[in-house]
Amino acid sequence: STAPVNDRDDLSMAYTPGVARVCTAIENDPSLSHKYTIRKNTVAIVSNGTAVLGLGDIGPEGAMPVMEGKALLFKEFGGVNGFPICINARTADEVVDFVQRIAPTFGGINLEDIKAPECFEIEERLRASLDIPVFHDDQHGTAVVTLAALWNSLKITGKKMEDLTVVIAGVGAAGVAIGKILLNAGIGDVIGCDRVGAIYTGRGEMNSAKEWFAANTNSSRKMGTISDVMKGADVFVGVSGPDLITAADVRSMAKNPIVFAMANPNPEIRPEQVDGLASVMATGRSDYPNQINNVLAFPGIFRGALDANATDITEGMKLAAAIAIAESVSDAELSPDFVVPSVFNRTIVERVAPAVAAAAVRDGVIRKS
């Protein structure tokens, strides 16, 4: 406990009759719940277990160890109390209804391991209906760290954001979010690929998320396979599956290519296959250099959002987090094998949280009391 209960006076303050004064104050001004209750530092980690790591749809019971691990990371790196909640809910309506009902207990909602395309609808509806931050980490945590790594990679290659063509393999939760944040950062063009091939306007076999992606990317309407659209591209970002591309594909890219092969546990191409071909290579694995890991993002993002008493997590807050993560790598440290900081760098949250909080103020999403 954070408050001692050693005598009758302590008990009367912690519970009845003293607690009634706090209850009445919150009844009259519900925003005070973010000041006087656990809401001020507690995030629900909600999953239905339909898209767990590389394991797939393993159900809520199977997902629980991942959510427990997430709670540990929230506390260890961000000082945030994360509460794992795995629910037996298959549809978007069920998940949205559940989260709306438990929202009064929490200061934020971290959605986790919910399959696409339902994850897009769930997050969108919850953001619209709740006055606390809602963040699908599989989408935005990955996107934020990817952008941070790309910014630092450009310092090495000398390329400019607005001149880049980026190919994204995998247009699911992470792929769509990466595309969005890259566009918001001023990227030249993005081309997404799924199992059918390149995403472009007018193509068939697309859900609503891919329809959005098609309408906002691939301005030249390139068609064909992943190998076709990689020709002349500056950056490859993989969030799909193992062994998807070859050394020949990387060789066909523009000069000084950047390759982020982030499929886990086995990347789209292994670093040893592009040694001497790629200027910068990153994966999602801890046993290779440049691990693009969400733990670099979500503790600081929620720490900043809670500290600011924010009601949402905006695109500006995500961009601020990406910049702060990128700047955690000093000029002296920056190298092709070190474009993202170590997850054990304890200064990252100290940089990310205030940057996110300041962005929340700029974007006007601070709770008014």
Tell what function each PLM region has:
Residues 211-280, 285-287:
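Rossmann-like adenosine-cofactor binding region
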